[in-house]
Amino acid sequence: MMAKIHEVKLHAKYFDLVLEGKKRAEFRKKDRNYERGDTLILHEWVQGVFTGRKVEARITDVTDLSDWLEDYVLLHRILGEILPLTVKLAVSSTFFINLRRRTVAIYLL
């Protein structure tokens, strides 16, 4: 199966966290068929307007959160390019989230 490209909006305060390497996953509505290996292009969005800044990432895992949050997924990603720049970043870590009193370990490869 061919990898798909998903272009999505991302608020400026979260966009900067992505660039700083502090935000490595996305909670997203399960309204697209996100799959491992797909490309995620995050477009910075400020007050209803695209700023032109965008970052490309590869989805490394998709966690279905339906047991905790209906119709949502958690996308794990490895940053690719900060567009139009050519900076490449790789991340590897584990973090924990608390969803409705359940702690879930998230592993980023």
From Swiss-Prot:
It comes from the Viruses. InterPro entries: DUF3850, PUA-like_sf. This is Uncharacterized 12.9 kDa protein in GpA 3'region. It comes from Escherichia phage P2.
